[in-house]
Amino acid sequence: MCSSDLEDLAALAESRPLQVRFIEMMPIGYGAAMPCISGPELLARFRRRWPELAPLPGAACAALGDGPAVYYTVPGWKGDIGFIAAVHGKFCASCNRVRLTSQGFLRPCLASEAGCDLKALLRSGASDEELLTAIRTTIWEKPQEHHFELKQDIPATRGMYRIGG
């Protein structure tokens, strides 16, 4: 998408009851080489166009899915704009997500290669208790936080579309 189209996309929330979300490119796999606009830069840009842009209260954000997005709106708008700033606005401590890949692998984090092969467990006849233990172990493996800002080479053995990102 062209950078010049971002305001037009955000403006859809002005006249329509939509939540338009902007996700900061995660530096994983091919995403590490792609140019991007940071969440804070995009928010500043939108505030220049819409000076009344203000964050929604926490309860209103939770009603929109209790995910990592931080939502903003302008008085009189029918919708909201959401920002998921994975690099510049770490939300790891409040992340309530795990990812189940299309290959049956449960990951505790998009930035992690850790996890468990639920498909293999299911096919081997694992008991409900064994499955529950594997899922709990994976959840406890969720990292405290990522370190994308260090610009380390974070390998992604699969495309983001395959790991639920």
Where are these regions (language model features)?
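Auxiliary Fe-S-binding modules of radical SAM enzymes
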Residues: E14-S15, M25-G165
